[in-house]
Every structure is written in structure tokens, then in C-alpha cells.
């Protein structure tokens, strides 16, 4: 369960806990070792209760229970999917802190139905006191005002709250800001090597800088409701081909020319933006609390296994283990950045 005593830290940092590459259970044992070393909570992906049961075996103990990100196809507009959420909540009561589900484009035109369904789900969740929260994540690119409005209508649903995905909110605002200046030109059509980029880069970076204020505004709006708010933290840039977010906060985007003295562009947030998001969340959610998950997917590299080599003594080729180890090291770096952005508790 979420909520904290006065002596507890004001925000919990989680990171993705999953098997990112092909291999056996040694990869999950590696994740368990690294999570225990960095002291981060876990957020795991699970499509079925049995799948979650399996992964939880490898998650090390932590003061904050794991958060579970359900399949992105789950649509809480539908009774059968709310029943699935309830099944997870019942089976893992007392073992997980929260369940994350995505919003959907169609919800924008069915707000009343969504709110009614979430009130119904909340009533069922409240029947089991040790059960998890359910967080509706901003993911479909709907107007942020709609998202806040839904949250306000569910203010009294004590077991239902919201997840702010800073990448999704930021990219929507970046695209809108750029479109205002360049109607008819879609940012998705551009890339780092586009010949038009030198003439457009200043406006693109101006739009990129507009992401942070909007994330902070949504954070303050939800914080005023007095509920626990969960955050998915990752960086991104509209010029990245394919998936434009889910990068770490120390990443820059390489370009083939110099802009402001560098042959790379700053992403939407960077370490400074991350610090602003975290500190604003802590300030905005004093009563309900806030939690954070480092949701970084896009990592390429290998790192020697070092102290974890014994886990893979039965492997002939440890390339995938080293890839997993490198990804975990990036999660660790970003988890430390996030934890260092949380203001210390005042001395008493």
C-alpha cells in the first residue's frame, strides 16, 4: 500500500524489473542482485496473474511494494478488463502497491462511462483493505485538460489515482507547439539527418523546452486532489526515429552539424528537468504522496558482469547477460539521479 509515516522518505524510486533479452532465469536473478544493490523498488510488466507470480519470485524485498504495469491492451472501459484488474488486485493484495493501466483514445468521447466504470472498480477494490491502488496512465495523447478533468471527477475514489507519463505528455506538447509555428509540417517527418533541420532546429528546440512546464502544470493539478500520484520517468526527443521516448536523462541526440556549440541536441528534460519534476511532485503531493518509476527502454551496450559472473557460470556466451547488465546500470544511474532530486526530510 502507498502512504507514508512521518519518518519515511517523501518519494519512492522504482525502476523497471524485467528480462530485457533472451536467456534464462539467471537474467532475472541478475536484476534482483542489481536492484538490491541500488535499493530501488520494482515496477514489473505482467499480462497474467501467473506471469506476475513468476516474476515476483525474483524481486528483492524493499520497503515499497512493487508496482505492476498491466498489458497495454487492457481497457477499463470494458467490464471484462476491469474484472481482470480486480483479479490481479485480489490475488496480490498485500504484495503489490499499485496496478497501472493505460488510457485510450476512445475514452475522450466516453468520459461518463469511464468515470462510472472506475467508480465501480473502486468500490470493489475498497472491499479488500490491503489491496493495491489502480493508476490510470496518460498514454493515448488526449488533451491534458481532459486527463485532469477525469481525475477531478474521481477525486473521491480512494483506490483509483493517476500515472503521469512525462514522455507522453511532453511529446504531445512539443508537437503542438511546433505545429503552431509550422502548420502542415509534421515533426514525425523530420529526423536528425534531414536537410531542413539546420533551418528548423531553433524552433524545434523551443518546442522541446515547452514540455517541462506542461508536465509541471499537470503535476500540480493532480497534486491538489490529495491523492497518491505515480510517475513514469524517461526522456525523449521528437526527432528520434521510431520510438521517440523511453531514454535516460543523461542522453543527448546526435546531429550532423553544430548547434549552440555542440553536435547534439538536448532532450526534453535532462537532469535539470528531472530534478524539477521530482521536486515539484514532492511539493504538490504532500498528503497523498508520489512515487516514481524509471521507465527507460532504449539502451544499447554491454557491461562486464564482474561480481555477477557466478550467475552465468552455465552460459557459454554471456553477450546477452552483459547487455542486460548494461541496461541495469543505466537504470541505476537514472534512479540515483531521481533519488538525489528528492528533498531531504526536515530534521525534527
Feature map (PLM): residue ranges:
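Histidine-acidic metal/acid-base catalytic patches
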Residues: 1-12, 32, 60, 81-97, ...
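Structural motif corresponding to the early beta-alpha repeats
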Residues: 36-113
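Short, surface-exposed basic-aromatic patches at helix termini and helix-loop junctions that form
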Residues: 36, 57-64, 123-127, 149-159
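Active-site beta-loop-alpha junctions enriched in small/polar residues
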Residues: 14-23, 45-49, 69-75, 104-106, ...
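Basic- and aromatic-lined ligand-binding clefts that recognize polyanionic substrates
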Residues: 131-155
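Boundary/entry segment of secreted carbohydrate-active catalytic domains
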Residues: 1-46
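Catalytic cores of phosphodiester-bond-cleaving enzymes
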Residues: 110-139
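Residue-level marker for buried hydrophobic side chains located in beta-strands
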Residues: 66, 134, 162-165
Amino acid at each position: 500500500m502507498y502512504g507514508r509515516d512521518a519518518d519515511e522518505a517523501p518519494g519512492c524510486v522504482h525502476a523497471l524489473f524485467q528480462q530485457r533479452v533472451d536467456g534464462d532465469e539467471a537474467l532475472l536473478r541478475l536484476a534482483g542482485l542489481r536492484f538490491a544493490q541500488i535499493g530501488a523498488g520494482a515496477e514489473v510488466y505482467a499480462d497474467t496473474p501467473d506471469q506476475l507470480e513468476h516474476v515476483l519470485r525474483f524481486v528483492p524485498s524493499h520497503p515499497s511494494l512493487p508496482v505492476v504495469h498491466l498489458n497495454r491492451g487492457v481497457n477499463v472501459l470494458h467490464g471484462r478488463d476491469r474484472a481482470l484488474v480486480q483479479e490481479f488486485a485480489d490475488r496480490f493484495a498485500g504484495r503489490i502497491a499499485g496496478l497501472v493501466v493505460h488510457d485510450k483514445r476512445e475514452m475522450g468521447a466516453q468520459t461518463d462511462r469511464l468515470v462510472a466504470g472506475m467508480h465501480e472498480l473502486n468500490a470493489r477494490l475498497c472491499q479488500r483493505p490491503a489491496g493495491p491502488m489502480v493508476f490510470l496512465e496518460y498514454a493515448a495523447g488526449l488533451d491534458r485538460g481532459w486527463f485532469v478533468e477525469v481525475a477531478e471527477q474521481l477525486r473521491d475514489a480512494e483506490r483509483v489515482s493517476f500515472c503521469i507519463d512525462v514522455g507522453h505528455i511532453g511529446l504531445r506538447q512539443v508537437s503542438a507547439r511546433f505545429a503552431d509555428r509550422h502548420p502542415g509540417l509534421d515533426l514525425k517527418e523530420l529526423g536528425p539527418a534531414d536537410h531542413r533541420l539546420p533551418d528548423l532546429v531553433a524552433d524545434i528546440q523551443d518546442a522541446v523546452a515547452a514540455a517541462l512546464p506542461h508536465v509541471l502544470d499537470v503535476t500540480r493539478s493532480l497534486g491538489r486532489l490529495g491523492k497518491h500520484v505515480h510517475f513514469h520517468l524517461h526522456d525523449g526527443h521528437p526527432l528520434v526515429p521510431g520510438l521517440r521516448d523511453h531514454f535516460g536523462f543523461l542522453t543527448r541526440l546526435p546531429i550532423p552539424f553544430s548547434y549552440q556549440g555542440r553536435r547534439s541536441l538536448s532532450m526534453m528534460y535532462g537532469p535539470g528537468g528531472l530534478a524539477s519534476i521530482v521536486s515539484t511532485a514532492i511539493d504538490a503531493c504532500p498528503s497523498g504522496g508520489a512515487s516514481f518509476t524509471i521507465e527507460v527502454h532504449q539502451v544499447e551496450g554491454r557491461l562486464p558482469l564482474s561480481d555477477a559472473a557466478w550467475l552465468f557460470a552455465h552460459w557459454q556466451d554471456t553477450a546477452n547477460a552483459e547487455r542486460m547488465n548494461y541496461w541495469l546500470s543505466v537504470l541505476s544511474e537514472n534512479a540515483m539521479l531521481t533519488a538525489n532530486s528528492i528533498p531531504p526530510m526536515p530534521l525534527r
